[in-house]
Amino acid sequence: MRSATLLLVSCVLLSFILGNVKEVEAVLKPMDQCGRKDIFLGGCGSNGSKTCINDFVKKGGVAAKPSSCECDDFGEEHLCRCYVPC
């Protein structure tokens, strides 16, 4: 009886954990968005997200405008990681 209870509790806990992981993944990346990375000259500045959005628009036009970005400085360049419409 003890082992059956332990098995049941383990299955319930595993179910909650797996369900939570799927919810977190859904929040992290919208389904209609694709990730893009690119390196640009200069630094991120005080608002790196806005810098990256402007860099992508300059490179690819308004159609390439990302919805959100992260910016990392690398010497005289910066790396932009953004989500754009697929």
From Swiss-Prot:
- What top-level branch of life does the organism fall under? Eukaryota
Q: Which InterPro entries match?
A: SCRL (IPR010682)
What residue range is the signal peptide? 1-26
Single biological process term from Gene Ontology: signal transduction
What is its subcellular localisation?
A: Secreted
UniProt KW keywords: Antimicrobial, Disulfide bond, Fungicide, Plant defense, Secreted, Signal
Taken from the UniProt record, the cysteine pairs bridged by disulfide bonds within this chain are C34-C86, C44-C71, C52-C80, C69-C82
GO CC terms, sorted: extracellular region
Question: What is the first-listed, main subcellular location in coarse terms?
Answer: secreted
Family per UniProt? Belongs to the DEFL family.
Q: Which PANTHER family does this UniProt record tie to the protein?
A: DEFENSIN-LIKE PROTEIN 229-RELATED, DEFENSIN-LIKE PROTEIN 245-RELATED
What name appears for this protein in its UniProt entry? Answer: Putative defensin-like protein 234
Q: From what organism does this protein derive?
A: Arabidopsis thaliana
